[in-house]
Amino acid sequence: MKRLEVSNQAKLPTQFGEFYIQCFREKGSNGSKDHLVVFTPNFSQNPLVRLHSECLTGDALGSQKCDCGGALQMALERISKEGGLVIYLRQEGRGIGLFNKVNAYALQDKGYDTIQANEMIGFKDDERDYSVAGEILEYYRIKKMRLLTNNPKKIAALEKYAEVTRESLIVCANEHNQGYLEVKKLKMGHLL
């Protein structure tokens, strides 16, 4: 935990029930990022875990261009019933940041897919780093988990820290995100 500062815990009542929240401040050469963990009290030795990267447009604004907001809502609902945690990483736009994500969206509006758009503005298809999530798992002493994901990169990253069993998280496609979901499946290897 040498590069993380940990906040106190606080209660968070939600539409899904009462959770607790705790912040982890990641310190790095480019400043700091505050990541949030939303969790149920007394989760099991094999909790449900959702590793979720920030998506302002999907999570807060309800964008139909992606499946992020729906995936977060489904995860919170399941975790409230079965116990576990959401590790909410501040890695907007698969790690490119909000400003660049909006520029990528503008290219998508012109017909480019999500990967092509990222590459056109100078980024890889996915710039995220999940090592901080591993440190957070270690903080909570999680050695085994049921990971709510369709992303094989998340599975591989967390297997370095704990035994992972994948549980799928399927959000319904719509006319705005169907192409995006196809790209995630065909070009990024997502298990959809």
From Swiss-Prot:
Protein residues bound to GTP: R50, L51, H52, S53, E54, E92, G93, R94, T114, T149, K154
Active-site residues, Swiss-Prot/TrEMBL: D126, R128
GO MF, one annotated term: GTP binding
Biological processes per GO annotation: riboflavin biosynthetic process
Cofactor(s) this protein cannot do without: Zn(2+)
Chain positions recorded as Zn(2+) binding sites: C55, C66, C68
Pfam family, one: GTP_cyclohydro2
CC terms in the record's Gene Ontology section: cytosol
DNA repair in keyword set: no
EC number(s) stated in the UniProt entry for this protein: 3.5.4.25
Database matches in SUPFAM superfamilies: RibA-like (SSF142695)
InterPro entries: GTP_cyclohydro_II (IPR032677), RibA (IPR000926), RibA-like_sf (IPR036144)
Keyword Magnesium set for record: no
Record key words, sorted: GTP-binding, Hydrolase, Metal-binding, Nucleotide-binding, Riboflavin biosynthesis, Zinc
Group of enzyme by EC: hydrolase
Catalysed reactions, as listed in the record: GTP + 4 H2O = 2,5-diamino-6-hydroxy-4-(5-phosphoribosylamino)-pyrimidine + formate + 2 phosphate + 3 H(+)
Cofactor note: Binds 1 zinc ion per subunit.
Pathway linked to the protein: Cofactor biosynthesis; riboflavin biosynthesis; 5-amino-6-(D-ribitylamino)uracil from GTP: step 1/4
Free-text function comment from the UniProt entry: Catalyzes the conversion of GTP to 2,5-diamino-6-ribosylamino-4(3H)-pyrimidinone 5'-phosphate (DARP), formate and pyrophosphate.
NCBIfam families cross-referenced by the UniProt entry: PRK00393.1, ribA
Homology family: Belongs to the GTP cyclohydrolase II family.
Protein name, as recorded: GTP cyclohydrolase-2
Organism listed in the record: Helicobacter pylori (strain ATCC 700392 / 26695)
Lineage: Bacteria, Pseudomonadati, Campylobacterota, Epsilonproteobacteria, Campylobacterales
Gene name of this polypeptide: ribA
